[in-house]
């Protein structure tokens, strides 16, 4: 994924590439769509929400350039994958999701990925 999809889109930051390498995207993809975990498509996650394409997630993470001493507010937890990438950077992440079903599945995936430097809230 990194060599064929991410680098060609100008994502070259070593911290971003390390995060993408370390955080298993497939953990955050619903079981029925795991075969598409690394495809350049939006993946439905329920509640009429989708995961972004991997290249867009990578470009967003590179543009944000999170630092270890930052506190980050993420509005819209979704699958939890971006939450995990932000947390991997060492930042303290607070994530808020309106849909209880999504916060529940994201919490499971984040726990499975051993991501702990975050707080999750359900709300609008």
For each of these PLM feature ranges, what is it?
Residues 65-124:
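Conserved nucleotide-cofactor-binding alpha/beta core module
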Residues 1-32:
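N-terminal auxiliary segments of SAM/dcSAM-dependent transferases
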Residues 27, 41, 106-108:
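Short secondary-structure transition/capping segments
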Residues 29-34, 76-80:
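Short hydrophobic/aromatic-rich motifs at helix boundaries and adjacent loops
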Residues 13-14, 54, 100:
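Alpha-helix N-capping/helix-start residues
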Residues 27, 32, 46-47, 86-87, ...:
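Alpha-helix boundary/capping detector
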Residues 3, 7, 32, 37-40, ...:
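Conserved alpha-helix/loop element of class I SAM-dependent methyltransferases that forms part
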């Amino acid at each position: 994924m990194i060599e064929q999809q991410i680098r060609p889109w100008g994502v070259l930051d070593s911290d971003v590439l390390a995060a993408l390498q370390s955080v298993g995207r497939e953990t955050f993809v619903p079981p029925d769509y795991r075969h598409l975990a690394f495809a350049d498509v939006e993946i439905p996650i329920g509640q009429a929400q989708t995961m972004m394409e991997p290249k867009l997630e990578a470009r967003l993470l590179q543009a944000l350039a999170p630092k270890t001493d930052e506190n980050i507010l993420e509005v819209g937890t979704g699958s939890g994958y971006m939450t995990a990438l932000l947390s991997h950077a060492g930042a303290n992440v607070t994530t808020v999701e309106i849909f209880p079903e999504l916060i529940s599945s994201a919490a499971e995936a984040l726990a499975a990925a051993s991501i702990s430097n975050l707080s999750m809230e359900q709300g609008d």
